[in-house]
Amino acid sequence: SLSTKDKAVVKGFWSKISGKSDEIGTEAVGRMLTVYPQTKAYFSHWPETTPGSAPVKKHGARILGAINDAVNRIDDMAGALGSLSELHANKLCVDPANFKILAHCLMASICLFYPTDFTPEVHLSVDKFLQNLALALADRYR
């Protein structure tokens, strides 16, 4: 679970990176589709899945918007992400293991954009936050 300190670190760091959230999201989704090509199966309806393409940019922005909502409701992530959990579980049928894959890619992308600010302390808190976010997204799978 997230400590009070973790929550403060995540909120502080997120406020710093939110200005580049669309770019970070685009990079993270592009990275996921490249490094884990099996994830492309969920996006077969897109005209293209290459990094930087319009669908990747749009989805990256959408994901980072949802994460921003989760940061703002850090004490109720399951509530903040309930409709997304429902969508991914029951309509899109996304394997919840992919949430952890995306979290890993997102941390790599954040580090590319903010190498100095992404200290070990920030890394630890963001990792814990993203793991809690993945659990919240998997909530409706039960």
Swiss-Prot record:
Pfam families: Globin. GO terms for molecular function: haptoglobin binding; heme binding; iron ion binding; organic acid binding; oxygen binding; oxygen carrier activity; peroxidase activity. Gene3D superfamilies: Globins. InterPro entries: Globin, Globin-like_sf, Globin/Proto, Hemoglobin_a-typ, Hemoglobin_oxygen_transport, Hemoglobin_pi. This fish has two hemoglobins: cathodic and anodic. Cathodic Hb has high oxygen affinity, low cooperativity and displays a small reverse Bohr effect. Anodic Hb has low oxygen affinity and cooperativity and displays a normal Bohr effect. Heterotetramer of two alpha chains and two beta chains. This is Hemoglobin anodic subunit alpha. It comes from Gymnothorax unicolor.
